[in-house]
Amino acid sequence: SPVEGYSIEVTKLPKKATFVTEFDDEIAEGLRISLEEEDGNLIEVSTPEGGTAVNFMSRLEQAIKDATLNLDVSYEKEESQLKISHKEFGQIKGFTITSFKDDVITGEQGVPKLFLGTDIEGSLEGERADGDGQILKGNRDNFMTADLRVAYIGEQMGEVGRVTLSQNAMQFQ
């Protein structure tokens, strides 16, 4: 690389697959859902009649832990809000939710709903780079940045920094 390094430009930030919905005791009562991660791991969680949102969340958290799904869940009781998100960024990191109770969670009973994240987009030294989660990779045909990979964890867009390569070592600025 030149002494000043290669510029890193981010035009789109990566996102995690995320699902947010209204959730309270009325919705939780008698609720049954299936939750499937992109790699095929599947769990099913239900609450009996008279079950509460807190009870459902406890069952959901335990099922996710037992199945080692790569998902985070949270419940804001004051806001009546359920949030499920993938722990990793990117378009291939997602999950599917199916609700088996009329008109709640996904809107249609028995119809799976897919949630995907997005990959980072940008360029390295003005050359095209493909995104994979938080990784920008210079295209194989690039003159200066072929196959160069840079992980970006910031929240800014535009020119976000430079990377310098010297004798197969990297120095970040």
Ranges and model annotations:
Residues 1-50, 62-173:
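Polar, low-complexity export/assembly segments characteristic of proteins
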